[in-house]
Amino acid sequence: MSEETTVRPERTERSERPERPQYRGNGPRKRRPFQRRKVCRFCADKDLVIDYKDPRVLRSFITERGKIVPRRISGNCSKHQREITEAIKRARNIALIPIASTHVVA
């Protein structure tokens, strides 16, 4: 077998390369503005307690449709998000919080 060498074309300088378009798809790329990381309000304020008997605190973690707000939106840490979920489910079970928005009497 004879040794074959592959000849690669010489690399061009950056300035000589054709420019790539700065967009993909239909329009220019949109950059998201920097968003500040949300802080768990229960970790920040140690006096605030998660209790299933306090529906005022729990309502801020429920959407208008009665769904539990996810952690990435509420800004809670995983420990407190689990506690909030459990407290909301307990409060729903004993009818302190409505299960869905259709159960709310206006």
From Swiss-Prot:
Region (Disordered): 1-34
GO cellular component, one term: cytosolic small ribosomal subunit
Entry's Gene Ontology BP terms: translation
Keyword Ribonucleoprotein: yes
Keyword Ribonucleoprotein carried by entry: yes
Key words, A-Z: Ribonucleoprotein, Ribosomal protein, RNA-binding, rRNA-binding
Sequence ranges of Basic and acidic residues compositional bias: 1-22
Recorded GO MF terms: small ribosomal subunit rRNA binding; structural constituent of ribosome
Assembly and binders: Part of the 30S ribosomal subunit. Forms a tight heterodimer with protein bS6.
Function: Binds as a heterodimer with protein bS6 to the central domain of the 16S rRNA, where it helps stabilize the platform of the 30S subunit.
Name the UniProt record assigns to this protein: Small ribosomal subunit protein bS18
Organism: Geobacter metallireducens (strain ATCC 53774 / DSM 7210 / GS-15)
Gene: rpsR
